[in-house]
């Protein structure tokens, strides 16, 4: 094939630029929920010489300027200002759920400040409403972070919910996706595992062996 006919391919799913989450469980029920991040695209834009490993810019999760928004629009105060010996306030929420000592689920997500609401909504769907994670993950999500005073919603928000929120005076700000959860659910009756990747929002995969 002539070089002039070689074209760039079209990715089937957009690749995430920062945070990654994975959930793992073995045959004995030993579980790991791991969320790690560069924070923003290419992190600090500095690589460890000779390794190609990028360093993150998690310093932005501190209130670099208390009272002013960070890169995600979060406005924080003096309690989260940069000081020696402190760990910055992070939204990363790797989660393992158990009941009576038995593993029930493993989940987490990228998404900056939307991570906590993504994990909370999935946990409530599973625990409070008994919705399996393979049904809960594709459902629409919403997020509020105090400032701006608006509810971020996904474009797939049902029309009746959108109308009801607007009727109550909420300002809605739509975005293509919120979060990108990856999870494993344990059937409480059979103790079997169900791995679910949030493939409706971005690239991801559930695998078992």
Which residue stretches match the model-derived regions?
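Catalytic core segments in nucleotide and nucleic-acid processing enzymes
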Residues: 119
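Active/binding-pocket-proximal capping segment
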Residues: 38-62, 68-71, 113, 122-126, ...
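C-terminal catalytic domains of large/alpha subunits in multi-subunit enzymes
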Residues: 1-16, 26-28, 61, 81-91, ...
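Glycine-rich phosphate/pyrophosphate-binding beta-alpha loops
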Residues: 23, 35-47, 94, 109-116
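Internal maturation/activation junctions in enzymes
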Residues: 1-38, 47-51, 58-59, 65-69, ...
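Glycine-rich, flexible loop/turn motifs
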Residues: 38, 42, 51, 78, ...
């Amino acid at each position: 094939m002539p070089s002039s006919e070689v074209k760039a391919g079209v990715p089937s799913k957009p690749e995430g630029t920062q945070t990654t989450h994975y959930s793992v469980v073995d045959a004995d029920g030993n579980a790991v929920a791991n969320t790690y991040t560069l924070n923003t695209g290419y992190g600090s834009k500095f690589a460890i010489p000779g390794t190609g490993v990028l360093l993150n810019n998690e310093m932005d999760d501190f209130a670099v300027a208390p009272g002013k928004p960070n890169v995600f629009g979060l406005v924080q105060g003096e309690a989260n200002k940069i000081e020696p010996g402190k760990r910055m306030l992070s939204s990363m929420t790797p989660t393992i759920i158990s009941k009576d000592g038995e593993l029930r689920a493993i989940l987490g997500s990228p998404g900056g400040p939307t991570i906590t609401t993504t994990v909370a909504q999935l946990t409530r769907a599973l625990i409070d409403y008994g919705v399996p994670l393979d049904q809960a993950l594709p459902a629409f999500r919403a997020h509020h972070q105090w400032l701006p005073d608006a509810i971020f919603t996904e474009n797939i928000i049902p029309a009746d919910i959108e109308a009801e929120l607007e009727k109550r005076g909420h300002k809605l700000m739509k975005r293509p996706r919120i979060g990108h959860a990856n999870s494993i659910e344990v059937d409480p009756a059979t103790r079997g595992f169900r791995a679910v990747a949030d493939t409706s929002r971005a690239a991801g995969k559930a695998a078992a062996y």
